[in-house]
Amino acid sequence: MRHSLTKLLAASGSNSPTRSESPEPAATCSLPSDLTRAAAGEEETAAAGSPGRKQQFGDEGELEAGRGSRGGVAVRAPSPEEMEEEAIASLPGEETEDMDFLSGLELADLLDPRQPDWHLDPGLSSPGPLSSSGGGSDSGGLWRGDDDDEAAAAEMQRFSDLLQRLLNGIGGCSSSSDSGSAEKRRRKSPGGGGGGGSGNDNNQAATKSPRKAAAAAARLNRLKKKEYVMGLESRVRGLAAENQELRAENRELGKRVQALQEESRYLRAVLANETGLARLLSRLSGVGLRLTTSLFRDSPAGDHDYALPVGKQKQDLLEEDDSAGGVCLHVDKDKVSVEFCSACARKASSSLKM
């Protein structure tokens, strides 16, 4: 009701010019007698409905009563200074009334305005949204309508949203500070003892174990490759030495094959000249010469027999008086040749000593 009266006074003051704005005398407005009576009745009703407001609105009631008694007397509109003083004087009563109103409420009721469960004392009147049909004091029902109910509900909704955001902000700050402190503790004590610390260590070990396994496998592969390469190198060195030996043996075998080919050609020629050699040898035997040969004897180590592998020939130191002086008689078909051959001479002398 106080707000409604303030609005009426402000409207009347805006319609009438003040003394400071114009030098003319203040305009007079004659209020009807029925309007003054209604205002006085409303004052009395408000005083009876809310006893806490009797003292605050006593002066206003007297002012309205004086206006009603004078009737057509000129009424001066309140100045802005008087309105401010009146608003300041009314603040303590509103604060105590708001505190009385909030004393019977819980936090959950404030946070859920759509389903209110407010249990107020019988003597307290709620300054919340009131409908014109009923609820609250009679003065509130007279002066407030559906628009005021919707505005009050919107204000209460905003108030509950603000409280919810404040609570969420406090909870978020506390949770973030707790998480930050826990993270700092874990960083300061990496091996520190706690359930979370041990779980973190287990997670770190689980993430590091595949890396360690991969590094160990790579190192093992490198060692295996190195060992394999070293084995190949040693095998190559051994095969190179063996190859050299085989090459030397191949050369020796090549020489032996060549000697065998020459000997085979020589023996084929002897067999081809068998008849002439047989007649010559028969005549020599008739002359009284003894025929000898080294064909059926084992050749000595220094023999140059081409059918046998050639070894290191040892030079036999022969005495001067034992030196052989024989000659080689070569019969080739119809031709007979005498050759001087030391090897044949040694064979001949060795056969004579038998």
From Swiss-Prot:
Keyword Ribosomal protein attached: no
Localisation per UniProt entry: Nucleus
Domain named bZIP: residues: 204-267
SUPFAM superfamilies according to UniProt: Leucine zipper domain (SSF57959)
Tissue specificity comment: In adults, expressed most abundantly in heart, liver and skeletal muscle, moderately abundant in kidney and pancreas, and barely detectable in lung. In fetal tissues, expressed most abundantly in kidney and very low amounts in heart, lung and liver.
Miscellaneous comment: Named 'Zhangfei' after a legendary Chinese warrior who was contemporary with Luman in around 220 AD.
Assembly notes: Interacts with HCFC1; the interaction inhibits CREB3 transcriptional activity. Interacts with CREB3; the interaction occurs only in combination with HCFC1.
Function field: Strongly activates transcription when bound to HCFC1. Suppresses the expression of HSV proteins in cells infected with the virus in a HCFC1-dependent manner. Also suppresses the HCFC1-dependent transcriptional activation by CREB3 and reduces the amount of CREB3 in the cell. Able to down-regulate expression of some cellular genes in CREBZF-expressing cells.
Protein name: CREB/ATF bZIP transcription factor
Lineage of the species this protein comes from: Eukaryota, Metazoa, Chordata, Craniata, Vertebrata
